[in-house]
């Protein structure tokens, strides 16, 4: 049987599906959300480094959705498949499919296994929505549909940047809250005398409000730094595919 395909077990209970790749075949539970590539990676890279961070998985789903919508808009994906895939991406981005991502964060291939985990799970979730059995890759294929015009080498770095941006926005909100709290104390303590210290020794008089004002300025500078970091992270290589020249991706 050709690589990257699956078939239901002839067993009358239909409790397994058989998936094939260039190495051979594996039996998976019929309702398993991932496929043969993820299962091989799960077995090969059981290194104990902890799971792939959920934030990265959720960010990767957003990248996959963007690619899906772009391919559909350009006519490269059937509309029903694109709609099912986009909805599946939303499920993962919302954190509703965490159990479908079993891989260790320490893995070979610079993210290839994680990319294939996303591709296979998204394909199966889309098949669920289309009323087809999981593993029916002739209907929704992990590579031919989910990973269309993409590579691990452009989607994985993009997902990392999206995850970093989302984390930075959490940090930005925290810095804003901290700055506001310090500024309120600056006003409340404006008339309270204090001693400024240098080298841990009493130095010159100041107010407690001035101390809190200085801390508020430090928080403001850190907030500005998060904004500048996000600006740089917005530049991504999506569309570059495997080596950056966009091979196998249409120019339109």
Language model: regions and residue ranges:
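Conserved, well-structured ligand/cofactor-binding cores
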Residues: 2-252
């Amino acid at each position: 049987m050709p690589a990257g395909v699956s078939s239901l077990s002839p067993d009358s209970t239909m409790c397994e599906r058989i998936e094939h790749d260039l190495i051979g075949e594996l039996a998976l539970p019929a309702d398993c959300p991932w496929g043969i590539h993820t299962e091989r990676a799960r077995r090969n890279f059981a290194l104990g480094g902890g799971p792939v961070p959920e934030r990265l998985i959720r960010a990767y789903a957003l990248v996959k959705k963007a690619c899906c919508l772009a391919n559909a808009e350009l006519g490269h994906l059937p509309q029903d498949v694109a709609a099912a895939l986009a909805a599946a991406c939303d499920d993962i981005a919302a954190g509703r499919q965490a159990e479908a991502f079993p891989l260790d964060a320490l893995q070979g291939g610079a993210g290839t296994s994680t990319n294939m985990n996303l591709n296979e799970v998204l394909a199966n979730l889309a098949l669920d929505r289309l009323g087809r059995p999981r593993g029916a890759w002739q209907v929704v294929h992990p590579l031919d549909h989910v990973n269309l015009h993409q590579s691990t080498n452009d989607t994985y770095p993009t997902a990392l940047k999206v995850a970093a941006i989302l984390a930075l926005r959490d940090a930005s909100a925290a810095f804003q809250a901290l700055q506001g709290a310090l500024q309120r104390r600056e006003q409340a303590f404006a008339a309270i005398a204090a001693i400024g210290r240098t080298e841990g020794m009493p130095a010159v008089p100041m107010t407690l409000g001035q101390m809190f004002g200085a801390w508020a300025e430090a928080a403001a500078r850190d907030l500005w730094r998060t904004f500048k970091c996000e600006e740089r992270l917005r530049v991504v290589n999506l569309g570059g595919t495997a080596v950056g020249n966009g091979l196998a991706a249409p120019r339109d």
